Amino acid sequence: MIKEFRDLIDSMIPVGKVVKPHGLRGEVKMKSLTNQLKVFETLKKVLLYDEKAGTVVRAEIDTIRRAGKGYIVHFKGFKSVEAAERIRGFYVYAPLNVLPPLKEGEYYFYQLLDCEVYDPEGEYIGKVTDIIETGANDVIVVTKELPDFTVEEELIPVIKDYIVEFRFKDKKIVAKRLEYLTLEGKEDNDDENQRIDDIS
């Protein structure tokens, strides 16, 4: 059963996440996990997956409409707020074959998520845990757990000035760190004001 599920998931990608119920008729608010929004124009049959419990639900989209940066979705058979509440936090998986082809230099969000990020010298920066859409360009959120169990977070714009190479098959990204992060900790405190002037 587990192998069958893994084989099934391998042929699908997460395109959304159920945030919360919407209204009283079984609709839900869904956060998009893909920057290729055309996928939602024809998307019908999906898998709903709860990572914590390992629960999988086959579902079919009845209606979907844009709402701000997310979507309002109604799955067939969901007729109440209680039914919608049961899938809160579930990921929405779509078949790979419904995705539109990519142009050179384009990517899907799922390709970035969980990638390990290294600087050009091979130093480990962290793992991609989220993606921020700014309008002008995407920004990856890179987090790293430190020895004292605190978490260090860096933001890296997905533009050619910072991204050196994508290695999606290896789930790796080579990227330059932001200038202020590179300088941090490498200058004496006496030079603090000079560093701020240089960056601004």
Swiss-Prot record:
Q: Which InterPro entries match?
A: PRC-brl_dom, PRC_barrel-like_sf, RimM, RimM_N, RimM_N_sf, Transl_B-barrel_sf
Q: Where in the cell is it found?
A: Cytoplasm
Which BP terms from GO are recorded? ribosomal small subunit biogenesis; rRNA processing
In this protein, which residues make up the domain named PRC barrel?
Answer: 103-181
Q: Cite the Pfam families for this sequence.
A: PRC, RimM
Which superkingdom? Answer: Bacteria
Keywords per UniProt? Chaperone, Cytoplasm, Ribosome biogenesis, rRNA processing
Q: Which GO terms describe its cellular component?
A: cytoplasm; ribosome
Please list the GO terms describing molecular function: ribosome binding
The entry sums up its family as follows:
Belongs to the RimM family.
Free-text note regarding domains: The PRC barrel domain binds ribosomal protein uS19.
Assembly behavior: Binds ribosomal protein uS19.
Task: Give a short account of what the protein does.
Answer: An accessory protein needed during the final step in the assembly of 30S ribosomal subunit, possibly for assembly of the head region. Essential for efficient processing of 16S rRNA. May be needed both before and after RbfA during the maturation of 16S rRNA. It has affinity for free ribosomal 30S subunits but not for 70S ribosomes.
Q: What is this protein called?
A: Ribosome maturation factor RimM
- The organism named in the record is Kosmotoga olearia (strain ATCC BAA-1733 / DSM 21960 / TBF 19.5.1)
Write the gene name. rimM
